[in-house]
Amino acid sequence: MRQIILDTETTGLDPRQGHRIIEVAGVEVVNRRLTNRHFHQYINPDRDIDEGAQAVHGISREFLADKPRFADIADSFLDFIDGAELVIHNAPFDVGFLNAELDLLGKPAVTTFCESVTDTLKMARDNYPGKRNSLDALCERLEIDNSHRNLHGALLDAELLADVYLMMTRGQDGLSMVFEESAQSITFNSD
């Protein structure tokens, strides 16, 4: 199974108010193993970045001035995610922004390019009801080192989320591993 653990950084909170993606990153997981393949791109949004958003990710409009626009990277991004399950923390936020960017290009929704979308925030809320379930809180709870995360960044956050997701779902492969081990030790007697 091929999965892309995905994150974006944006100019603000709402694409309906003209906010844009300024960074997108995905790390590839195949059969529950990181492959070291990733997609990462900073994007020129052709607009100002809200102060609140910049305080979260530290990315300035000046830094993005010479970066490509989403239209320039859309096809390579879509090729990277094609056919994969997307795993995203607070998926409606990122999917909403991706769909807004694709709509500006006359392209269909991101879900037409991927197998499915899994929201790790929803998973975390189901697994840890009543607890904080931010990426930082999950890293702390699952003992994943995020000490190098001073600001949000799409690639770093996708890498951390991959570790979080694999830890949160680690029991899901337990039965298949036991079955595979048992299947190897089964012998058939033909009478």
PLM features: what roles do these ranges have?
Residues 1-115, 125, 137-151:
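Conserved non-catalytic scaffold segment of RNase H-like nuclease domains
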Residues 85-91, 97, 134-190:
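Acidic, Mg2+-coordinating catalytic module of metal-dependent nucleases/exonucleases
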Residues 20, 38, 71, 132, ...:
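Alpha-helix termini
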Residues 114-132:
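Catalytic subdomain that performs nucleotidyl-dependent activation
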